[in-house]
């Protein structure tokens, strides 16, 4: 795990130090999708990731009951349903619940505890997705944003009203909100209201 993290850190530093005069790189695929990466912040983000990883490894992972307690009773007036909490060897422990607002509208909340060695490893994988980038095509868009002083990812399918919002909270939780017929602004508001930020 540490060897993989060290390799990743070196690659990120090399990318940042070898950047061209342009601080953003845009790649376009054959299907018209575009992805833009802001290389100016790679070195800073890699250092932040390394420091946070070291702190996460020192923390003790939560129990199943503590994980379940992270899930609110209600979101948007909908009661918590299909709740589960899972401890998996080698992966981050997580809790998850669904909140059905009506027949076509629902929110799913997942909270990953990034504490301990396994959780810190999950954080490293998830954090790579939080480097500064933007992807856009006819079907969907995904981009990193600033959310209360930290990186977050927002993603929406354009033809359906289906969005996802992922952020890091309380210096240990990777929080993911998914909404069917719930827009990205509403998911951000829900994320702001959770006691996890």
Residue ranges and their predicted role:
Residues 26-52:
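Post-signal peptide N-terminal segment of mature Sec-exported envelope proteins
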Residues 41-45, 49-50, 135-197:
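A short, solvent-exposed beta-edge/loop patch
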Residues 4, 30, 42, 102-104, ...:
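Generic structural motif
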Residues 54-154:
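Short, solvent-exposed recognition patches
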Residues 9, 93, 105, 171-173:
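Residues at beta-strand starts and edge strands
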Residues 1, 23-25:
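N-terminal export/targeting signals for secretion/compartment entry
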Residues 1-16:
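Sec-dependent bacterial lipoprotein signal peptides
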Residues 18-21:
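Bacterial signal peptide processing site
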